[in-house]
């Protein structure tokens, strides 16, 4: 299967917006390969089901969920509710879905409800949840951005692949890359690139590192 001319559903724990993290970049890049990509926002209360066009090949889906605390129930019951939600989303998309690419374990542990040829569970963070075992067992492939993340699935009988975070072509092109933001080019400059909105970012340790290395300049880059 080539990743072109497919209908792809991306299940994201972060909403579509101005700040992009890995899920948003995957959606954008996959849409550039002539795929029709549907980016599923986290479920929200009191929101009408909708499909917003971002580009000709990229759409954002908002949907309402009347079910709360679903992951406290047995898997057999969750499966029934997930079938209902999947049917609702397929109606919104109005296409058969070729690939379900899920970045979080909380909404659809039983990915087969979408009747897709390919299902991927792709954690880029460590999720401390019992339901993660269910989605790992039911996905066809498991991707992960680090060995530490993937080691948690060593006992799951699935094909597992390490997929590092990507780098935009912009940063590899010296003609496009701007370094004008560097104040002191003759000093040692330290860069941190990542999701600065991450709720578990160890700000105290970062502050200690900066204060104990005053001879260096630090640049934090990211949403």
Where are these regions (language model features)?
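Acidic anion/phosphate-binding donor-loop and adjacent secondary structure
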Residues: 130-133, 167-186
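Carbohydrate-associated surface elements
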Residues: 148, 165-166
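A conserved catalytic-core segment of Leloir-type glycosyltransferases
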Residues: 47-94
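Conserved donor-binding/catalytic core segment of Leloir-type glycosyltransferases
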Residues: 182-201, 207-210, 218-221
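A short beta-strand/loop micro-motif in the catalytic core of glycosyltransferases
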Residues: 38, 101, 138-146, 160-161, ...
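Membrane-proximal helix-turn-helix segments that form the acceptor-binding/catalytic region
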Residues: 84-92, 108-109, 113, 125-145, ...
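Active-site proximal beta-strand in glycosyltransferases
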Residues: 99-102, 111-127
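N-terminal subdomain of nucleotide-sugar transferases
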Residues: 1-48, 210-213, 217-218
């Amino acid at each position: 299967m080539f990743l072109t001319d497919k209908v792809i559903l991306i299940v994201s724990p972060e909403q579509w917006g101005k700040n992009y993290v890995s899920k948003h970049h995957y959606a954008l890049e996959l849409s550039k390969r002539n795929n029709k990509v549907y980016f599923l926002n986290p479920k929200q209360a009191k929101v009408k089901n909708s499909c917003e066009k971002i580009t000709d090949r990229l759409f954002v889906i908002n949907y309402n969920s009347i079910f709360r605390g679903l992951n406290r129930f047995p898997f057999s019951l969750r499966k029934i509710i997930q079938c209902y939600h999947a049917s609702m989303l397929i109606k919104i998309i109005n296409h058969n879905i070729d690939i379900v690419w899920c970045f979080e374990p909380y909404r659809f542990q039983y990915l087969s409800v979408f009747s897709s040829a390919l299902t991927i569970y792709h954690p880029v963070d460590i999720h401390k949840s019992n339901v993660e075992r269910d989605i790992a067992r039911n996905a066809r492939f498991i991707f992960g951005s680090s060995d530490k993340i993937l080691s948690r699935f060593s006992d799951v009988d699935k094909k597992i692949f390490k997929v590092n975070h990507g780098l935009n072509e912009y940063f590899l092109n010296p003609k496009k890359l701007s370094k004008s933001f560097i104040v002191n080019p003759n000093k040692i400059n330290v860069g941190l690139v990542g999701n600065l909105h991450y709720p578990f970012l160890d700000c105290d340790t970062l502050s200690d590192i900066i204060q104990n290395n005053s001879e260096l300049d630090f640049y934090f880059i990211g949403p």
